[in-house]
Amino acid sequence: MNRFLLAAMTALMLPFTAAADEPVPVEVWVCDYKEGQTLSDLEDWYDDFNKLSDGMDNPNFEAWIWTPFFADLTMGDVLVVTSFPDLESMGQSMMEFFGGDETGALFARYQTIVDCTGRDLWMVQQMRDRD
């Protein structure tokens, strides 16, 4: 239940750049670092992920690393969060990422850094823009 609440609050608080009329899909992975791995390792992975993503046919997504600050620390070490403009774009990006040889190798490296025990998809609707 705590994992559910934290994931829900996290997804609802994502800072989208523009107010959306329709909810957008947000994928939330709940992860623990594998032995000897740290935030720095995950940040290094994201450097390579971003380079590879820039070359994808559909790089239309945003990604965040959420580290607990004032939260249920038993839930996980880190939340890995990705948002997409719509479900079609999400499907295209996921098929491309999980279906390619180079991207598959990158995901295999990701799995050496974190052990993700939860993966949820939320539909998030921004209700207030800070501008």
Describe these PLM feature segments.
Residues M1-F4:
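Positively charged n-region of N-terminal signal peptides that target proteins for export
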Residues G104-F107:
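Non-heme di-metal
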Residues A7-P15:
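Bacterial N-terminal signal peptides
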Residues L14, A18-D101, T112-D131:
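Short S/T/G/P-rich N-terminal loop/turn motif that feeds into the first structured element of a domain
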